[in-house]
């Protein structure tokens, strides 16, 4: 399954997505479920929903697809610059060593960092005009849909949840904006 949520690297104007499979039966089932549960007009063997992508979303995506490789390259450039120039020891980059060595590939839909004083860093960056987000504000095992997991002790998940902060990383950023983010994060060392 592929999400084309507007904030993604290949994002539509509204919600959109796609499913790819080499299984014809699964493809038929997915088509039916995304068409109100109908595999042919007025016949509904399944409970489904309207999940069809409209033509406008498809047209936007077909144009944006041409730029995806270049956009992802730019995101990688920004991420590399962050990893090489953010020197604040309070800010960590999970998995950075692997992608800097080229062991793994990454397209940086978001650029998450970990910081034990995450809330203070977020407020500081906000004061500097730098937008950030927490991905995601509620850890999966604490979601209402999983009440049976609420009592689980998941110390690593909970620590990451307390420390994760996503900093700006998108292809429209200028080099000057990227440097500004780095300088602000590095200066946070002296103020926190």
Q: What are the residue ranges of the model-derived segments?
A:
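Conserved active-site segment immediately N-terminal to the catalytic lysine
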Residues: 1-12, 40-45
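Generic detector of well-ordered alpha-helical packing
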Residues: 4, 16, 55-56
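Adenylate-forming
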Residues: 12-16, 61
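PLP-dependent aminotransferase class I/II
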Residues: 22-192
């Amino acid at each position: 399954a592929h999400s084309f949520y507007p904030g993604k690297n290949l994002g539509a104007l509204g919600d959109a997505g796609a499913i790819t499979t080499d299984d014809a039966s699964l493809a038929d089932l997915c088509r039916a479920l995304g068409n109100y549960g109908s595999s042919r007009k007025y016949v509904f063997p399944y409970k489904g929903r309207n999940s069809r992508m409209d033509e406008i979303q498809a047209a936007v995506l077909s144009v944006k697809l041409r730029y995806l490789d270049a956009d992802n390259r730019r995101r990688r450039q920004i991420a590399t610059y962050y990893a090489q120039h953010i020197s604040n020891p309070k800010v960590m980059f999970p998995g950075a060593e692997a992608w800097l060595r080229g062991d793994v590939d990454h397209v940086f839909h978001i650029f998450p960092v970990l910081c034990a004083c995450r809330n203070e860093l977020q407020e500081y960056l906000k004061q500097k005009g730098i937008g950030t987000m927490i991905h995601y504000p509620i850890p999966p095992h604490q979601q209402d849909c999983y009440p049976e997991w609420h009592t689980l002790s998941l110390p690593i998940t909970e620590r990451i949840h307390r420390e994760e902060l996503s900093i700006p990383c998108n292809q429209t950023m200028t080099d000057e904006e990227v440097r500004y983010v780095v300088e602000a994060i590095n200066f946070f060392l002296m103020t926190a």
